[in-house]
Curated annotation (Swiss-Prot):
It is found in: Cell inner membrane. The keyword Lyase does not apply. This is Cell division protein FtsQ. Its main location: membrane. It comes from Geobacter sulfurreducens (strain ATCC 51573 / DSM 12127 / PCA). Essential cell division protein. The keyword Transmembrane helix applies.
C-alpha cells in the first residue's frame, strides 16, 4: 500500500480589526490668551516706567520743581570758606532735591586740593548736608617748585602767592619720584613726618632748631641744623634713640657748629663728629 501524504494547509490567522482612536485637537486658545496678557502686562509696566522716568527728569529740571532745596549745611571749616565750598559743589537754593546728583557733587568737591575727604547727604524734604575733612600741611617739599605735604606723606598742593612758608622744608624728592614710584616715595616722606613728630617732642633740640630735612632712599634722612646748617645723618628709623645720643653732645657743640663739617648718628653705639 502506498502511504498517502496529505499536504496540510495552515489557514492564515485572521487579522483583528484595529480600533482607530481619534486624537483630540489641541486647544491653543488658553495659551494664546495667557501669552497675550503677559505681553500686555510687560508693555504696560514698560510704559508706566517710561512715564515715571520722564516725569522724574522733567521735575528734576523744572525751575520751580516740587521739593526745592532750601538749606545747605556745611561742616565746620578751618581754611576753606563756606561760600567757596557751596560754589564748587554747584548747588544753590531752589534746585530740585530729586535732581541732585550726590556722587557728582562729591567728585566736584574732591578736586579741591585742600579737601581730603568729602561726604554729601540729602535729607528730605529740603536739606543738603556737605561734610568736609580738610588737609593740614605739616611741611613744604622742595621739588623745584614748593609743595605742601600733609601728615600722611601726601604732596597735595603747589604753593601760590599768599601761602605760608612757616613749615619745615623737605628736600631730596623730585616730581619724577612721585610719578615713577608714588607708594615708595610716600612711605619715605612718612618717615620724615615721623622724625618731625619726634623733634616736636624734644626739649633741648626741637623742630625749630632744624632748617631742612633731606631725604635719600638709600641712606635715609639727614637733618640740617638751623645754627650753621650742619648735616646730621640719622639714616632709617630709630630716630628717638639717635636723637637722644645727639642731644648729649649738642649742648657742647652748639657754640662751635661753624667748625663742624657733619655729624653721623647712624650707628648703634657711637656718634661721629667730623670737623672741617
Amino acid at each position: 500500500m502506498r502511504d498517502l501524504h496529505v499536504k496540510t494547509r495552515i489557514k492564515p490567522a485572521q487579522t483583528r480589526n484595529r480600533v482607530k482612536r481619534e486624537r483630540k485637537p489641541i486647544n491653543w486658545r488658553p495659551l494664546i490668551t495667557w501669552g497675550s496678557r503677559l505681553v500686555c502686562g510687560l508693555a504696560g509696566l514698560a510704559t508706566v516706567g517710561g512715564i515715571c522716568y520722564g516725569g522724574y527728569r522733567y521735575l528734576s529740571q523744572w525751575e520751580f520743581a516740587p521739593l526745592p532745596l532750601k538749606e545747605i549745611e556745611v561742616s565746620k571749616l578751618q581754611r576753606l570758606k563756606r561760600d567757596d565750598v557751596i560754589a564748587q559743589a554747584g548747588v544753590r537754593p531752589g534746585d530740585s532735591m530729586l535732581g541732585l546728583r550726590l556722587r557728582d557733587i562729591g567728585s566736584q568737591l574732591a578736586k579741591n586740593p585742600w579737601i581730603d575727604k568729602v561726604q554729601v547727604r540729602r535729607y528730605f524734604p529740603h536739606t543738603l548736608a556737605i561734610e568736609v575733612v580738610e588737609r593740614v600741611p605739616v611741611a613744604v617739599v622742595n621739588m623745584g617748585f614748593l609743595y605742601y605735604m600733609d601728615a600722611g606723606g601726601t604732596v597735595f598742593k603747589p604753593l601760590t602767592q599768599g601761602d605760608s612758608l612757616d613749615y619745615p622744608v623737605i628736600t631730596g624728592v623730585a616730581e619724577e619720584d612721585l610719578a615713577r614710584d608714588p607708594v615708595g616715595t610716600r612711605e619715605a616722606l612718612k618717615g620724615a613726618v615721623a622724625l618731625m613728630d619726634q623733634l616736636r617732642r624734644g626739649k633741648e633740640f626741637t623742630l625749630a632748631d632744624v632748617s631742612e630735612i633731606h631725604l635719600d632712599k638709600g641712606f635715609g634722612l639727614t637733618l640740617f641744623t638751623a645754627a650753621g646748617g650742619v648735616p646730621v645723618r640719622l639714616g632709617n628709623g630709630g630716630y628717638e634713640a639717635k636723637l637722644a645720643r645727639f642731644v648729649r653732645i649738642y649742648g657742647e657743640l652748639r657754640e662751635h657748629m661753624a667748625a663742624v663739617e657733619y655729624i653721623d648718628c647712624d650707628y648703634l653705639d657711637k656718634i661721629i663728629v667730623k670737623k672741617g
